[in-house]
Amino acid sequence: MPIPELQSLPVLVTGGAGFIGSHLVDALVLRGASVRVLDNLSTGKLENLRASKDRVELLEGDIRDLAACQRACEGRALVFHQAALGSVPRSMEDPASSIHVNVTGTANVLAAARDAKVRRVVYASSSSVFGDSEALPKREGEEGRPLSPYAVSKWMNEELGELFTRAFGLETVGLRYFNVYGPRQDPQGPYAAVVPRFFDACARGEAPLIFGDGEQSRDFTFVADAVLANLLAAGAPSERCGRA
């Protein structure tokens, strides 16, 4: 499956100042796309866009604001929807915020994209959708029950994506990220991911803190591979749209 031609293509990246989003922005700019970013900068950082700032249009706004989404989608051919509250622990402490941002926000992005005649929306789902399924390897169609409000929100994103494809003809593709890590990932704060925490501890000459007996395993994805998945999804055949 080839990466589509992106030269001069008008695209939107929601959450484009964030960890994954900013790497995606860099890749799109490198390929000549005309990039617009929508980000409320609550977790995203302007410094993440330093390499591409002169070639990116930045709209500061929130995906919970439909009008902001409509302005951002205007004139775009392709949308990469990365904006979200991305922490399972945070969703357990504050489920309402995760649902509001991740579900209402995604519904707004999809509705704005539909109304602006955007061709395709590639959005970030999550491996958490597999829930309590013990099946290995993980396959689509073998999902279990969700284990957190965050997982519920991402499952609802997939349902919304499928609905908008079926009901309105808006092409959507969801990507179930597995524990993405890499540069620009914040090692600080109560919801920091394990890989940047390990690197941060090692940089300070400390031993990484491992809970349990150390026999547990997780699947990790380097951020450049997540970016490549987004680019490939942008060029996937239309018959594959409407599903994660």
Predicted regions and their residues:
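N-terminal Rossmann-like NAD(P)+-binding domain of SDR-like oxidoreductases, especially those catalyzing
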Residues: 1-180, 224, 230, 234
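Generic signature of intrinsically disordered, low-complexity, basic-rich segments
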Residues: 13, 120, 170, 188, ...
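Short, charged helix-to-loop "capping" segments that act as catalytic/coupling loops
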Residues: 69, 187-191, 237-242
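Short, polar/charged, Gly/Pro-enriched helix-capping and turn/loop motifs at alpha-helix termini
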Residues: 105, 136, 187, 208-209, ...
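Glycine-rich "substrate-gating" loop/helix at the edge of Rossmann-like oxidoreductase active sites
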Residues: 147, 178-192, 207, 212-224
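Alpha-helical substrate-binding/gating segment
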Residues: 180, 196-208, 220-244
